[in-house]
């Protein structure tokens, strides 16, 4: 019996350690019940129809975006972008329980003196934009259940979107009883992109148990799964896309004015590790994992996990009209099939005008490739609408298709037909998307350095230097980073042959761009005085990662492949993309190179980013790993980061190197910065585990307890984070025999890993823990979904390391930089 108990304890510890089956009892508790396609959202439960969610028309944000003049429809689109959350406050409340309380947006919004942060330093600490017209609270607000939320200034008028008579909230549960009904736009929170909603679960019983002091000060209270908070927090598009204007930066980043803010520049400064793990405790491995996201980046598959940690820089939205026009001029067509045919297209809303040219019935769309891997490929509106699902709209349905954060359950596609049938929130979002698209077309104009305060001081190079920069750009960069280009020969336009033949077309295109004929034509185009006008500064094509040599984890993302969560939002052309071949990866402990065969079916590519306003968007690469970070949004700070980042890009020897392996690997490996553990607070597990099993766990793994909290580890400092985070928990796309072999290998690995950790003494050092784990590294790599650990490598064009001839001279690199600053 004792041996049986010990084996059970080992297995449970292994599962907890990798946060996979994570406390399977909690996952089952939260996920048991209905099947996909059988549930409705809160709006439908309350008897609301999509037509009752009318888009707000008040031009409250008129000073944003450089004061651009908008039509009434564009005003509605901007309001939707900024304040419409589509009922996703339910999702962010549920996620607090899945994350064991370490994620809590109400804490992020608070200025309680016991926290590490407040409104006074919210920008510098979180990188979140303080909404104008608010100030720091001096105490708990009795009108808001004692919570320390920002207070609206007396000299400001009311927020028009809070008007519940004009925009009546969804009356379910306790709303209208123990809490107000509220508006369907919620209340302003003091942070742009986050709105407060009365919690319909905050009934009389919850109100009696509520204690604001304990919520801020007592972990046994606020780290309990059954805690019901009086508010839920909804998230709009603005959370990830609003930031300080590069050409009108605030004098004080903690207190911006509306005229200092842009809706399209992107949240380039937010710290997702601190936002999604408010204690920011580096002893927690989850914080270590989130910390791999540099400021201004996040993993878009963090929730619907694909077992790949792939932080991506937040997209700026520039030149949308030019981007769409480029899709047409390059004949960048995608063929839709299956559920992707159900997406709304611009033609469904516009009967004439330029926005009608991007779809041809029954199945052809000319579109931008929005996600970094080019997976958003079913039309501009499909890309806009999908994002709302990814931030929690109709979470009742979405969460039935996977286990959030931890995985361990086969992912199935969320179907547009189910969304339309069961979610008024979804239908309202679809109806408002065309106005959003029109707003983004109008507002996504470039931010030029020459128009920024003091920008001229950074544009002092001679005309001759910039002219040389144009030649260098034409020869080295424009084949990818210009939407204006010579017409490719027949069979050499990759954009026109997306699908199984794409890579062959790409190879022909790439060879053509090396010819003198191409370069001479391209030089003429770049020298033209109108080169920057209506130029997206990208051809928006998908580039094979074998050519880029960048980290492979982003292009390996699988959320949009056939049968996965975003199946209905990617084209058949994307799903039919061929394998790009083999990449080289490096053992994170020895530096030894190995080969990895990239799969087919959509993965393996990265779409070309635009260079519009590149002076303002450093650090570089798809994960913000090339260049330093400066929290100041001033022109001087942006230029300081740009200069350092562009030097690292063009002189790769200046990039950060791995402290353990140095030059044995081509860059930096993200490693844990301190000894860490996977932690599960007592309030999230004790009540669900029988006393006998808790006692057995204590006997066999005494070092895994911190009081009643579970503490699985230790994970030593210096551990490659992606060695653990990228472990492929479930077999995918394999026959039964291969899947069984994978599962057997995984079970054996987890058992041995748990056993190795169990044997460590209570006073084990990092060296002891590393010694215990090291023998298992080859097996961890074998079962990794992405074994590429070097995060800042690649994009060596013009440096001599791209395999295309000698690099540029230092003078030519300086000339190129002089030109880039004018973009």
Show where each model-derived region lies:
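Periplasmic c-type cytochrome electron-transfer domains
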Residues: 4-15, 19-823
């Amino acid at each position: 019996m004792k041996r049986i108990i010990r084996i059970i304890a080992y297995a449970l510890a292994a599962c907890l350690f990798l946060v996979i089956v994570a406390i399977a009892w909690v996952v089952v508790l939260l996920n048991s019940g209905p099947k996909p396609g059988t549930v409705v959202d809160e709006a439908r439960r309350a008897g609301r129809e999509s037509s009752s969610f009318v888009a707000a028309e008040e031009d409250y944000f008129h000073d944003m975006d450089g004061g651009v003049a908008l039509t009434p429809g564009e005003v509605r689109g901007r309001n939707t972008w900024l304040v419409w959350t589509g009922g996703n406050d339910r999702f962010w409340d549920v996620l607090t329980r899945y994350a064991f309380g370490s994620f809590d947006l109400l804490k992020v919004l608070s200025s309680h003196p016991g926290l590490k942060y407040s409104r006074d330093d919210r920008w510098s600490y979180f990188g979140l934009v303080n909404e104008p017209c608010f100030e720091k609270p001096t105490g708990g607000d009795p009108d808001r259940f004692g919570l320390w939320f920002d207070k609206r200034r007396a000299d400001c008028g009311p927020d028009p979107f809070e008007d519940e008579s004009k925009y009546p909230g969804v009356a379910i549960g306790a709303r209208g009883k123990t809490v107000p009904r509220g508006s369907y736009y919620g209340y302003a929170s003091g942070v742009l992109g986050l709105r407060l909603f009365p919690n319909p679960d905050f009934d009389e019983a919850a109100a009696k148990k509520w204690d604001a002091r304990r919520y801020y000060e007592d972990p046994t209270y606020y780290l309990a799964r059954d805690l019901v908070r009086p508010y839920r927090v909804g998230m709009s598009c603005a959370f990830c896309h609003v930031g300080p204007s590069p050409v009108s930066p605030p004098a004080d980043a903690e207190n911006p004015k509306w005229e200092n803010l842009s809706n399209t520049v992107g949240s380039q400064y937010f710290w997702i590790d601190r936002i999604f793990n408010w204690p920011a405790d580096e002893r927690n491995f989850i914080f270590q994992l989130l910390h791999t996201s540099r400021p201004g980046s996040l993993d878009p598959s963090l929730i619907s996990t694909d077992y790949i940690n792939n932080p991506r820089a937040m997209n700026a939205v520039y030149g949308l009209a030019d981007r769409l026009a480029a899709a047409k001029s390059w004949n960048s067509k995608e063929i839709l099939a299956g559920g992707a045919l159900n997406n709304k297209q611009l033609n469904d809303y516009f009967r004439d005008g330029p926005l009608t040219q991007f779809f041809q019935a029954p199945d052809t769309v000319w579109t931008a490739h929005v996600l970094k891997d080019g997976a958003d490929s079913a039309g501009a509106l499909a890309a806009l609408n999908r994002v709302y699902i990814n931030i929690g709209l109709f979470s009742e349905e979405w969460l039935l298709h996977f286990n959030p954060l931890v995985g361990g359950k086969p992912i199935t596609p969320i179907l547009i037909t189910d969304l339309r049938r069961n979610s008024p929130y979804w239908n309202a979002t679809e109806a408002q998307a065309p106005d959003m698209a029109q707003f983004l077309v109008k507002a996504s104009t470039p931010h030029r350095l020459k128009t920024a305060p003091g920008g001229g001081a950074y544009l002092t190079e001679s005309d001759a230097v910039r002219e040389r920069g144009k030649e260098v750009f034409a020869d080295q960069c424009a084949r990818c980073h210009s939407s204006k280009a010579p017409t490719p020969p027949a069979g050499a336009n990759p954009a026109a042959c997306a699908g199984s033949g794409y890579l062959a077309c790409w190879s022909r295109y790439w060879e053509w761009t090396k010819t003198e004929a191409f370069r001479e034509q391209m030089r003429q185009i770049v020298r033209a005085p109108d080169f920057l006008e209506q130029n997206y500064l990208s051809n928006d094509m998908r580039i094979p990662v074998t050519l880029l040599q960048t980290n492979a984890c982003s292009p390996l993302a699988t959320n949009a492949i056939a049968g996965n969560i975003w199946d209905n939002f990617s084209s058949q052309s994307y799903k039919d993309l061929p394998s790009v071949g083999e990449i080289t990866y490096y053992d994170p402990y020895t530096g030894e190179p190995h080969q990895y065969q990239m799969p087919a079916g959509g993965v393996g590519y990265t779409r070309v980013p635009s260079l519009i306003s590149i002076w303002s968007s450093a650090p570089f690469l798809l994960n913000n790993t090339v260049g330093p970070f400066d929290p100041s949004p001033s022109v001087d700070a942006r230029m300081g980061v740009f200069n350092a980042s562009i030097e690292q890009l063009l002189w790769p020897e200046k990039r950060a190197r791995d402290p353990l392996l140095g030059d044995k690997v081509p860059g930096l490996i993200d490693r844990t910065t301190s000894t860490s553990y996977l932690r599960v607070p007592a309030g999230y597990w004790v009540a669900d585990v029988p006393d006998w099993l808790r006692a057995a766990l204590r006997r066999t793994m005494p070092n895994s307890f911190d009081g009643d909290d579970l503490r699985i580890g230790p994970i030593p400092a210096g551990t490659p984070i992606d060695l653990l985070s990228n472990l492929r928990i479930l077999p995918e796309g394999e026959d039964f025999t291969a899947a069984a072999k994978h599962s057997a290998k995984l079970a054996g690995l987890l058992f041995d890993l748990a056993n190795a950790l169990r044997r460590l003494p209570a006073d084990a050092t990092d060296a002891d823990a590393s010694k215990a784990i090291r023998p298992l590294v080859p097996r961890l790599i074998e079962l990794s979904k992405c074994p590429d650990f070097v995060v800042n490598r690649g994009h060596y064009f013009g440096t001599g390391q791209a395999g295309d001839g000698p690099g540029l001279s230092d003078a030519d690199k300086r000339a190129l930089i002089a030109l880039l600053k004018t973009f």
